[in-house]
Amino acid sequence: MSEQQQTTIEMVDGLSEIADYMQDEELTAALTFIAKIIIKPDIPLNVATVEIVRLQAIAAKMAFKATWMANVDKNDRAKKNIYYTAAESINNLVSALKYIMR
């Protein structure tokens, strides 16, 4: 995790612990963006446009990883559940970003 990400993500209680536990760069990037939105919810439309695509791709990765961990690599139940939650939550965030684009 870069120092800039660490500073931003640490400003929102609980997110840095999740990032540290999961050790997943894309999830950390999504959590950092979530922290930025919590801190300053006014998102420029050009930023929202780029983030919609990026976050949707991250959510897809999270869903695939969770399914993989549920069906093939069944060793880490806790991480699997966090990936499921991340995929759903990021998809919900993407839906909200799409709404503000209208």
Task: Cite the ranges covered by each PLM segment.
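Amphipathic alpha-helices that form helix-helix packing interfaces
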Residues: 11, 18, 34, 55-58, ...
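Non-transmembrane amphipathic alpha-helical segments
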Residues: 59-69, 90, 97
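Short, charged, amphipathic alpha-helical segments
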Residues: 28-32, 53, 77-91
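Short terminal alpha-helical segments
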Residues: 3-35
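Short amphipathic alpha-helical heptad-repeat segments
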Residues: 4-11, 48-66
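Charged, low-complexity interaction regions
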Residues: 20-28, 42-46, 67-81
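Periodic self-assembly scaffolds
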Residues: 28-35, 50, 57, 64, ...
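Amphipathic alpha-helical coiled-coil segments
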Residues: 44, 89-102
